[in-house]
Amino acid sequence: MKASMFLALAGLALLFVVCYASESEEKEFSNELLSSVLAVDDNSKGEERECLGFGKGCNPSNDQCCKSSNLVCSRKHRWCKYEIGK
């Protein structure tokens, strides 16, 4: 009876260690994945766009909206919108 209790407790302890180790690996993987995503995001911040995209805030006196996409800076709303009719 004592031997079976000892084996059961040893089995539970082993199961705990295995589960804890696999959970630690999962956390490390998710942390690495998150770090790589944030690193890619930081790299893209360094690259300034030459023009502003749709819905981006702008200044009508200094229109920096993308002309190639038919965007203009709205004087009323102060954001880049599509110019219709041209």
From Swiss-Prot:
Mutagenesis / variant outcome for changing S61A: No important change in activity
Site label Interacts with channel, positions: K76, R78
Maturation-removed propeptide residues: 22-49
Disulfide partners: C51-C66, C58-C73, C65-C80
Expressing tissues: Expressed by the venom gland.
One GO term describing the cellular component: extracellular region
Signal peptide: 1-21
Cited PROSITE patterns: HWTX_1
Subcellular location as annotated: Secreted
Keywords of the record: Amidation, Disulfide bond, Ion channel impairing toxin, Knottin, Neurotoxin, Presynaptic neurotoxin, Secreted, Signal, Toxin, Voltage-gated sodium channel impairing toxin
Modified residues (Isoleucine amide): I84
InterPro entries: Huwentoxin-1 (IPR011696), Huwentoxin_CS1 (IPR013140)
Coiled coil: none
Primary role: Neurotoxin that selectively inhibits neuronal tetrodotoxin-sensitive voltage-gated sodium channels (Nav) (IC(50)=44.6 nM). It is active on Nav1.2/SCN2A (IC(50)=22.4 nM), Nav1.6/SCN8A (IC(50)=50.1 nM) and Nav1.7/SCN9A (IC(50)=48.9 nM). It shows low affinity for lipid bilayers.
Additional facts recorded: Negative results: does not affect tetrodotoxin-resistant voltage-gated sodium channels or calcium channels.
Subunit structure: Monomer.
Family label: Belongs to the neurotoxin 10 (Hwtx-1) family. 22 (Htx-4) subfamily.
Domain notes: The presence of a 'disulfide through disulfide knot' structurally defines this protein as a knottin.
Protein name as annotated: Mu-theraphotoxin-Hhn1b 1
Organism: Cyriopagopus hainanus
